[in-house]
Structure formats: structure tokens, C-alpha cells
A protein has these predicted regions:
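Conserved S-adenosyl-L-methionine
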Residues: 172-180
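Short alpha-helix
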Residues: 149-171
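Conserved SAM-binding loop
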Residues: 5, 12-118
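Alpha-helix C-cap/termination motif
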Residues: 8-9, 103-104, 169-173
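Conserved SAM-binding loop and adjacent beta-strand
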Residues: 1
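Short, glycine-/aromatic-enriched active-site segment of Class I SAM-dependent methyltransferases
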Residues: 123-127, 134-153
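Conserved class I S-adenosyl-L-methionine
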Residues: 108-136
């Protein structure tokens, strides 16, 4: 899908936000494995990444503060986050993540996440429960034994409208399009 929407002709560097250390699943770092035509790959992750595909790796949360040196080292033409924004915690942290991605981008930012109102929640595989108000959803997840996912800091799904509202705050910095 991304290759059909983005012109990669002048993309020379790539930044993967939220890289996982897990390389055992086909979905792990899926996009990074498919962008081998881009010369320089960079990574930001709160995990320790041992992967020789990356030119630069910064072990840091994407919601943190970045020094000018870190920004200069990691700034890339194409910055992508695949299934990360729902794991950074609060709405404020989600905003901070996007703000940092803008600072780290020369040209293009892609944020991929599951829509909160997709019928099956992909982390728990439970249908429709996540349609409930977030507070009730979290209580039920905890009762069902999904304590990790019941905490906002570990899972905070966004609806189309919530994502749009975050992006509207950056209209003076970026042009954006949301695909459903």
C-alpha cells in the first residue's frame, strides 16, 4: 500500500520509529525488510536493537526530548511508525510522538495504526469490546486477564477522529492525509 502512495525516487534515508528486537515473526520490522532499496536505514526504539540493517540506532522512547545532535544524526527523508503510536501511552504522548517524527523528517511521515473501531482488536483478538468507552474497556480487559493491555501506557487505541484531531494540531507544520 505504501509503495503505491509514496514516490520513493528521491528517498535516500529511512527512519523506523518503534523498531522491535523481535525478528522471529514475519510481521516483525516488516516494512524495514521491504525497503532495502533505500540506502540509509535508521532506528529509534526503547528496545535494544541488534540489527546490522541500520546505519544508526538510538535506544530511546519516541516521546522523549531529542538533542539537536540526535535529530541531525537520525533525520531522514522517510520516517515511519508501524503499530507504535497505540503503545506510547496517553493522548499527550501520542501528540509528542508525532511532533518528534516531524522534527526527524526531511520529507515524508507515515503513521500506521489499527483503527479503534475495527471489529477485531488485533492485540487481544477480542471482537467489539474495544468499542466500549475506554475506562470500561480497560476494566473488562483486566477482569479477562489482559492486565498489560488494560493499562493506557501499554495500549491506547485511536479512532479515525482522534488521529485526525492530533494531526490538526500540526497543520501549520505538515500536510497530511489519513487513509482508512
Amino acid at each position: 500500500f505504501i509503495k503505491s502512495k509514496v514516490n520513493f525516487k528521491n528517498i535516500n534515508s529511512y527512519l523506523d520509529v518503534g523498531t522491535t528486537e523481535d525478528e522471529h515473526h514475519e510481521s516483525s520490522n516488516y516494512l524495514n525488510k521491504r525497503f532495502d532499496f533505500i540506502k540509509k536505514h535508521n532506528s529509534i526504539s526503547d528496545q535494544k536493537i541488534k540489527n546490522n540493517r541500520f546505519s544508526n540506532i538510538l535506544q530511546k522512547t519516541i516521546t522523549g526530548n531529542f538533542s539537536q545532535n540526535e535529530i541531525d544524526t537520525l533525520r531522514s527523508d522517510f520516517v515511519i511508525s508501524n503499530a507504535t503510536i497505540e503503545h506510547v501511552g496517553s493522548f499527550d504522548n501520542q501528540e509528542k510522538m508525532i511532533d518528534n517524527m516531524i522534527k526527524l523528517s526531511n520529507k515524508i511521515i507515515v503513521i500506521q495504526t489499527i483503527n479503534r473501531f475495527f471489529p477485531i482488536e488485533t492485540h487481544t483478538k477480542l471482537p467489539f469490546l474495544h468499542f466500549l468507552p475506554k475506562k470500561i474497556h480497560r476494566i473488562i480487559l483486566k477482569i479477562l486477564g489482559y492486565k498489560y493491555y488494560s493499562l493506557e501506557e501499554n495500549l491506547n487505541l485511536l479512532s479515525y477522529y482522534e488521529m485526525r484531531n492530533i494531526l490538526k494540531k500540526f497543520e501549520n507544520k505538515i500536510d497530511y492525509k489519513i487513509y482508512r
